[in-house]
Swiss-Prot record:
InterPro entries: Aldolase_TIM (IPR013785), Alpga-gal_N_sf (IPR038417), Alpha-glycosidase_related (IPR050985), Glyco_hydro_27/36_CS (IPR000111), Glyco_hydro_36 (IPR002252), Glyco_hydro_36_C (IPR031705), Glyco_hydro_36_N (IPR031704), Glyco_hydro_b (IPR013780). Changing D548N: Loss of activity. Optimum temperature is 65 degrees Celsius. Belongs to the glycosyl hydrolase 36 family. Optimum pH is 6.5. The active site is at D478, D548. Has properties that make it suitable for elimination of D-raffinose from low green syrup in sugar manufacturing process from beets in order to improve the yield of sucrose. Pfam families: Glyco_hydro_36C (PF16874), Glyco_hydro_36N (PF16875), Melibiase (PF02065). Keywords: Carbohydrate metabolism, Glycosidase, Hydrolase. It comes from Geobacillus stearothermophilus. The keyword Hydrolase applies. Homotetramer. It catalyses: Hydrolysis of terminal, non-reducing alpha-D-galactose residues in alpha-D-galactosides, including galactose oligosaccharides, galactomannans and galactolipids. This is Alpha-galactosidase AgaA.
Length: 729
């Protein structure tokens, strides 16, 4: 790792892990992109294109018709002065103009990585772990300065980027577009990957070739959303899971985002990422500044799996924080699919008794414990215990659960309010709304206005009081609708389009305060399942409920796609009842267990109604998972067979010292007279022998290069899980 500046060539060379990222000051201070890829000693211009006089590409210097910003590979481009591609930023002046011209002013290089004020971001524990470059660009005419921040990590092929706008002039500026990064590739000979989905089928992998024009993944929902995820990748045509070049872009933010690739007339590709400029503006008074969120860029020459492993380790160790970052996560039982709203203290205690018998460690009480919450039509915001259901309160219930040797956890949804609630009747102006318009509801609820400091203060104190009222060690933080009528009664008209981003800043403040007050509590984020599974949430809460769809077969694609970016320690995965409540499928308890044991393991069904056979199998599942939990949650993850490409799925976990591994294989549908097949493993020590429980002892090289035969079985939804241990030689 190093960041170097060569004053003779005016080149910046960032070395991150085994990758190089090179920029150069060009002409009169324009910042050009030169190279990003496998580490090189130096870049002397072997790949530099000749400068040509291109028709309809204007020239900022009329005396040189071979220079146009329209053809320059850039780092943070503007619009309006000869570049017709999508800009990284756009600023409106008081005279209505949106033309700006940023040129190099200065730079500084220093050890470590600064935190972003009020925003989640990756971090370092020691300044030797990374080096940061700040390049200051300025528009002297209007007094605008933009500081581009690049951090290169020593351990990983990781460059993080963000931008800070400062108004050092005398007039008010309005940001219309303020993306976190942009980078131009000299060729568009790539595929691109994004993770589209919907409620119940989040983060499916979609790969397609780049084409001329704009292709994008974005959210305008006020959240990162089920429908898209703040991640894209450029993938070399020949790249697959284990070989080839991949460029990953992941946005550390939980609100509206834009991840865009534009292929221009000359076959170059511009990748841009940041806050979605749709319905966004931000006023910058003289002396004020605006900080964009962070983008984490990963280069891999080891295919998609190489990219994923970098994201996994970085996000697990340098994005997630707190006591649970490195701690094994408990096996839980959640009552939601067992009872929905229809429960009382006796039902929950009975579930806890059975859970203790099975070896489960944590009982989570889901929605319905507060106010008059007998359905989803009332009481959100009234965070007072329903004594009819829980006559001894949360404290009394939690103590009964604790006496059984179990921890107690709780569901909350602090960002929402029901119109039929005491909170709404008292403060109808506390929700997002615009004057004289009806307030649209989703799941019979409205969104609290977290852009307001008084609302955030109220939520911090109210939820803190709840969490302090009982021995609670786990919280599931839910959010069950997206934003409409986005406006705030606390902001003036000219700042209304700041509301969505101010909401996110308020949410991050609330989460930071509450998680800091209760460091002993494991927080799991949720948004109708995986509707806000993003890096921003992981900064405050180290795990996320992956999807409300608990069907084992559906989860193969959901968890496989999620693993493209997010570590296994972040994925909540539960065994639920059959027929499954979301899709009606009936899969065996064995298969449901194997899928759920591929994440943070738990159960979500009425365990008081189990047969003795089911109880015995669950006891075995719980005991087995406890034995492999650290390997699953913190081991190196390899994807082996994609459920998006066929009828099978497989993945494996390998310990850091390669002495132990766990392999999971799944086949969805049976086939008559099916061919025999084998599975090639990954990540083992080629010089080491491994014992596969029940199969024998084999060399790591044989298992990786020749593979292991898959048993022949004739039924739908089958699964196998093999544990490998190195044989002492």
């Amino acid at each position: 790792m190093s960041v170097a500046y060569n004053p003779q060539t005016k080149q910046f060379h960032l070395r991150a892990g085994k990758a190089s990222y090179v920029m150069q000051l060009f002409r009169s201070g324009y910042l050009a992109h030169v190279y990003w890829g496998k580490a090189v000693r130096d870049v002397r211009g072997a790949r530099a294109f000749p400068r040509l006089d291109r028709a309809f590409s204007p020239n900022p210097d009329p005396s040189d018709r071979t220079f146009s910003l329209d053809t320059l590979l850039q780092e943070y481009p503007a619009y309006g002065n000869t570049d017709f591609r999508a800009p990284a930023y756009q600023v409106q002046l008081e005279n209505g103009s949106t033309v700006t011209d940023l040129r190099y002013k200065t730079h500084r290089i220093y050890k470590g990585k600064p935190r972003l004020n009020g925003l989640p971001a990756t971090y370092v524990e020691h300044e030797q772990e990374a080096e940061t470059l700040e390049i200051v660009l300025g528009d002297a005419l209007i007094g605008l300065e933009v500081t581009l921040q690049y951090t290169a990590y020593e351990k990983w092929n990781v460059i993080t980027r963000s931008a800070r706008f400062e108004n050092k002039g005398g007039e008010r500026l309005k940001l219309l577009r303020a993306l976190s990064m942009s980078v131009d590739f000299p060729t568009a000979d790539y595929d691109w990957i994004h993770l589209p989905g919907a409620w119940g089928r989040e983060r499916w992998i979609e790969r397609r070739p780049l084409v001329t024009g704009v292709q994008a993944a974005e959210s305008r929902r006020g959240a990162s959303s089920h429908q898209q995820n703040p991640f894209i990748a450029l993938v070399a045509k020949n790249a697959d899971e284990h070989q080839g070049e991949v460029y990953g872009f992941s946005f550390v933010y939980s609100g509206n985002f834009l991840a865009q690739i534009e292929v221009d007339q000359f076959g170059t590709a511009r990748v841009s990422m940041g806050i979605n400029p749709f319905d966004f503006t931000w006023l910058l008074q003289p002396g004020e500044s605006f900080q964009t969120p962070e983008v984490v860029m990963v280069y891999s020459d080891q295919g998609l799996n190489g990219m994923s492993q970098t994201y996994h380790e970085l996000y697990r160790t340098r994005l997630a924080r707190g006591a649970f970052r490195d701690r094994e996560r408990p096996i839980l039982i959640n009552n939601w699919e067992a009872t929905y709203f229809d429960f009382n203290e006796e039902k929950i205690v009975n579930i806890a008794r059975t859970a203790a018998e099975l070896g489960i460690e944590l009982v989570v009480l889901d929605d319905g414990w507060f106010g008059e919450r007998d359905d989803d039509r009332r009481s959100l915001g009234d965070w007072i215990v329903n004594r009819r259901k829980l006559p001894n309160g949360l404290d009394g219930l939690a103590k009964q659960v604790n006496e059984l040797g179990l921890q107690f956890g709780l569901w909350v949804e602090p960002e929402m309010v029901s119109p039929n609630s005491e909170l709404y009747r008292k403060h109808p102006d506390w929700c997002l709304h615009v004057p004289n318009r009806p307030r649209s509801e989703g799941r019979n609820q409205l969104v609290l206005d977290y852009s307001r400091e008084d609302v955030c203060d109220y939520i911090i104190e109210t939820i803190s009081n709840v969490l302090a009222s009982a021995p609670i060690t786990y919280v599931k933080w839910d959010m069950n609708r997206h934003m409409t009528e986005i406006g705030s009664s606390a902001l003036p008209p000219e700042r209304q389009r700041e509301t969505a981003h101010r909401y996110m800043l308020g949410l991050y403040r609330v989460m930071d305060e509450i998680t800091s007050r209760f460091p002993h509590i494991l927080f799991e984020s949720c948004s109708g399942g995986g509707g806000r599974f993003d890096p921003g949430m992981l900064y405050y809460m180290p795990q996320t409920w992956t999807s409300d769809n608990t069907d084992a077969v559906s989860r193969l694609k959901i968890q496989y796609g999620t693993s493209l970016v997010y570590p296994i320690s972040a994925m909540g995965a539960h065994v639920s009842a059959v027929p499954n409540h979301q899709v009606g499928r009936v899969a065996s308890l064995k298969t449901r267990g194997h899928v759920a044991m591929s994440g943070n393991f738990g159960y979500e069904l009425d365990i008081t109604k189990l047969t003795e056979t089911e109880k015995q199998m669950m006891k075995q599942q719980v005991a087995f998972y406890k034995d492999v939990r650290r390997l699953v949650q913190f081991g190196t993850f390899y994807r082996l067979l994609s459920p998006f490409e066929g009828n099978e799925a497989a993945w494996m976990f390998v310990s850091a010292d390669r002495s132990e591994a766990l392999v999971a294989y799944f086949r969805v549908l049976a086939e008559a007279n099916a061919p025999l097949s084998y599975l090639r493993l990954k990540g083992l020590d080629s010089n080491q022998d491994y014992e596969i429980e029940g199969l024998g002892v084999y060399g790591g090289d044989e298992l990786m290069y020749a593979g292991v035969a898959l048993p022949y079985r004739s039924s739908d939804f089958i699964s196998m899980m093999w544990r490998l241990k190195a044989v002492q030689q």
